[in-house]
């Protein structure tokens, strides 16, 4: 018997997928509509439009923007459309929501853009931890994306994987 140690994990056909590889890489800027509201409470159309005209939207050029309103004000839908029209001229990538929500939305979109054919018939382990906190939504998205393609889908690490799905 040889004393050689064999790394069975390295020699296995398993593919380890780290969802953090699909995390958004561009920084997300926040534009809070409350800054354009009268006393940050309600919208006066004339003043709202005037403040938007005076605002320097060039700070958002070619950036990802989380557009939201952090106050409890009731903001009409057209106000978000109007702000979006200004951001569009700055070539911004605009999403509605808080910064973290937009991050998760883009993250899920990145997972959705994965080509499942590259995992056709393979055994895939989705890592359970990484540098970025991952939400249940992301694990649901990858399961939906890969289940009909892979031969086996697992969660965790190769040394302690939890079976999720196995093609029969």
Regions found by a protein language model. Name each.
Residues 1-74, 91, 149-152, 156-157, ...:
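N-terminal, charge-rich interaction modules
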Residues 42, 104-111, 136, 143:
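Peripheral peptide segments
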Residues 64-70, 95-97, 123-129:
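Short glycine-rich or small-residue beta-strand-to-loop segments that form or flank ligand, phosphate
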Residues 79-118, 156-161:
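Long, charge-dense
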């Amino acid at each position: 018997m040889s004393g050689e140690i064999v790394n069975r994990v390295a020699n296995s056909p398993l593919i380890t997928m780290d969802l953090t590889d699909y995390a958004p890489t561009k920084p997300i800027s926040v534009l809070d509509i409350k800054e354009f509201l009268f006393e940050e409470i309600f919208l006066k159309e004339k003043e709202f439009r005037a403040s938007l005209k005076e605002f320097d939207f060039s700070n958002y050029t070619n950036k990802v923007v989380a557009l939201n309103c952090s106050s409890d004000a009731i903001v009409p839908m057209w106000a978000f459309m109007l702000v979006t029209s200004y951001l569009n001229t700055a070539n911004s990538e605009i999403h509605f929501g808080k910064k973290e929500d937009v991050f998760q939305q883009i993250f899920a979109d990145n997972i959705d853009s994965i080509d499942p054919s590259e995992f056709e018939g393979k055994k895939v382990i989705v890592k359970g931890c990484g540098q970025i906190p991952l939400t249940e939504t992301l694990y649901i998205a990858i399961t939906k994306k890969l289940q009909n393609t892979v031969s086996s889908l697992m969660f965790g690490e190769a040394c302690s994987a939890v079976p999720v799905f196995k093609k029969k």
